[in-house]
Each structure stands twice: as structure tokens, then as C-alpha cells.
């Protein structure tokens, strides 16, 4: 089972991007599950999501505690301790940022880090700060799913 955790902010399309991944994997014959986690907060508040992909029925229904893939839609969330909590060794980490990897002050965990200026791409193409589509492209490339 592949487990993916999303960290973003309300309005960035975190939930929609996870729904698109689940729909895509289900249509390809796999099983997918997405559990969003957010409150009644307004746009800009932290949003989390937990996604699973497997070849068989997914019976577990809880948060993803040990992700193999981490999608971070806002680099200001890198400072939150729970962002990297439980990260599997050699996990894939995709970060929406304009900074290079050395500037991010990432924890000393063995991981494969990919950065993309998804916000810049979104602003250039749709003139809105909704980076989910560019993040989906980075996800597809980095994970080869």
C-alpha cells in the first residue's frame, strides 16, 4: 500500500488534487482512499489530507502516520513539527517553493526532495494562487504513478 500525506492551506486545492489522484487510480483499476482533515477555518488555514493507493481493498480508515510520499503545498508549513513526523526513509517529498533545497532547512531525514514553483506556474497560467494542478504534475513525475 502506498501512503501519501498532504500539507497545504485552505484555497490551494489540496483536497481537489487528492480527489483527482483517487479518481485516477480507481479508474485505472486500483483502490484509492482519501481522508481530508480540516476545520471550519477560513481560506489560508492549514489543511491536511491522507491518501492511500493499493492493489486490493483498503480497510484501514485513519490518518497516514508514515507516508512514503509527502506533498507540501506551502513552504511555510515546513516549520511545523508534524509536517515531517513519521516520514518513511527514502520518502518522496514534493514542495511548492521558489527556494532551492539548501535554503529550506529541512530535517536530517533521508528523503528524495523535489521542488516546484507551483504557485508561480498557477499565477502565470490561470492568474490565481491555486497550485494544485502544477503539484499534480510534479507528483506524477516524481512518483511515476
Segments (PLM) and residue ranges:
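Active-site cofactor/cluster-binding pocket
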Residues: 1-145
Amino acid at each position: 500500500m502506498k501512503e501519501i500525506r498532504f500539507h497545504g492551506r485552505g484555497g490551494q486545492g489540496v483536497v481537489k488534487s487528492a480527489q483527482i489522484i483517487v479518481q485516477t487510480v480507481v479508474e485505472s483499476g486500483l483502490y484509492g482512499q482519501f481522508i481530508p482533515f480540516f476545520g471550519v477555518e477560513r481560506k489560508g488555514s492549514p489543511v491536511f489530507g491522507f491518501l492511500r493507493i493499493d492493489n486490493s481493498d483498503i480497510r484501514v480508515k485513519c490518518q497516514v502516520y508514515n507516508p512514503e510520499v509527502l506533498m507540501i503545498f506551502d513552504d511555510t508549513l515546513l516549520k511545523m513539527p508534524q509536517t515531517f513526523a513519521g516520514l518513511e526513509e527514502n520518502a518522496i517529498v514534493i514542495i511548492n517553493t521558489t527556494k532551492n533545497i539548501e535554503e529550506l532547512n529541512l530535517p536530517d531525514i533521508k528523503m528524495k526532495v523535489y521542488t516546484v514553483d507551483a504557485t508561480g506556474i498557477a499565477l502565470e497560467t490561470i492568474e490565481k494562487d491555486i497550485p494544485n494542478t502544477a503539484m499534480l504534475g510534479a507528483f506524477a513525475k516524481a512518483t511515476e504513478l
